[in-house]
Design a protein with these regions (language model features):
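Catalytic histidine-centered segment of alpha/beta-hydrolase-like enzymes
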Residues: 277-290
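The serine-hydrolase catalytic nucleophile loop
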Residues: 42-54, 68, 257
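Alpha/beta-hydrolase fold nucleophile elbow
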Residues: 102-115
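Alpha/beta-hydrolase active-site loop
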Residues: 48, 81-102
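Short beta-strand/loop motif that positions the catalytic acidic residue
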Residues: 238-239, 245-247
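N-terminal cap/lid segment of alpha/beta-hydrolase-fold proteins
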Residues: 1-30
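Alpha/beta-hydrolase-fold enzymes
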Residues: 122-203
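Conserved alpha/beta-hydrolase
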Residues: 55-75
């Protein structure tokens, strides 16, 4: 594993922190395909995305996990800003960097993500033809999720209050050195509305997977950008790359994987359902993760 810093040309002056996971027998004099792995909203490269990158490397693939702009060990202020457009652009910035590495075959770059990172990956692939194959795990279209709720039970118009809240947060931020925030996962166990989101609390705030660089919240000023965002915008026209979707049969978020499958223009697309798994199961529970990695490794090895 190699730690690298990735300067970006995104107009934000940000440097991304990343970890390259190398397969056994890696030889820098040869060329390899590589998989970019994007982390969930609120996560960091040492959590789910790093686990998938590590396991892909164990399957013989070169993989890179990175921290989003404003998060983890990457630079940028304000900290914990969740700008969906920058999150998607981060993926292309990593691809920029990969094209400079002599051991990367620039014609064989794939990308995958977990949770919101999956939605951002789909969006990056819509906009960046250098991404030749796309994988998603427990996909979340963050705009849909905030507008329509975890299980798609809320109408778009009811999300107007979030835009109002985010707008007011900007005014508050302008007057204070301490920025307004809100949770990306329940901050306390008692705040979780169901078992699946209780697991999100457990993942981010207990020894199960907590990390000091992943506080579990975002800036409230991000809300207006998120509410109007569609990670799958124009997927029915431009998402033509091979697409492998992985989701749990018990995931409340599964409808967002279904939507991606329906909307993607790709003629080579499929969904693999993992029996008994919920959204969070695919972050770190070994039997489920191993099944997901097996599917994704086969997919990337055959498409790149």
């Amino acid at each position: 594993m190699q730690k690298v810093s990735i300067p970006t040309l995104n107009g934000q002056g940000i440097t991304l922190a990343a970890l390259i996971h190398q397969p056994a027998g890696f030889d820098a004099s040869k060329q390899y395909p590589i998989i970019v792995v994007a982390h969930p909203g609120g996560g960091v490269k040492e959590q789910a995305s790093g686990l998938y990158a590590q396991k892909l490397a164990e399957q013989g693939l070169l993989a890179i996990a990175f921290d989003a702009s404003y998060q983890g060990e990457s630079t940028g202020v304000p900290r914990q800003l969740e700008n969906p457009y920058v999150r998607s652009e981060d993926i292309s910035a990593v691809v920029d960097y990969l094209t400079t590495l002599p051991y990367v075959d620039a014609a064989r770059i794939g990308a995958m993500g977990i949770c919101a990172g999956a939605g951002y990956t789909a969006n990056a692939a819509i906009n960046d033809r250098r991404i030749k194959a796309v994988g998603t795990v427990s996909a979340v279209n963050i705009g849909q999720m905030f507008r329509n709720g975890w299980e798609n039970t809320v109408k778009d118009a009811d999300a107007l209050s979030y835009i109002e809240h985010g707008s007011q947060a900007r005014s508050s931020d302008a007057k204070s050195a301490e920025l307004a925030t809100l949770p990306l996962a329940p901050m306390r166990e008692e705040d979780a509305p169901n078992e699946e989101l209780r697991e999100a609390w457990e993942y981010y705030h207990t020894p199960r997977a907590q990390h000091p660089n992943a506080p579990g919240f975002m800036t409230a000023r991000s809300l207006p950008q998120i509410i109007t965002y569609d990670a799958y915008h124009k997927a029915e026209v431009f998402l033509t790359q091979p697409l492998q979707i992985v989701a749990g049969t018990q995931a409340g978020s599964k409808w967002m994987s279904d939507d991606l499958l329906a909307r993607a223009a790709s003629s080579d697309k499929s969904m693999h359902l993992i029996e008994g798994a919920n959204h969070m199961s695919l972050y770190d529970k070994q039997p489920y993760v191993n099944e997901a990695v097996s599917v994704l490794a086969d997919f990337f090895q055959s498409r790149l």
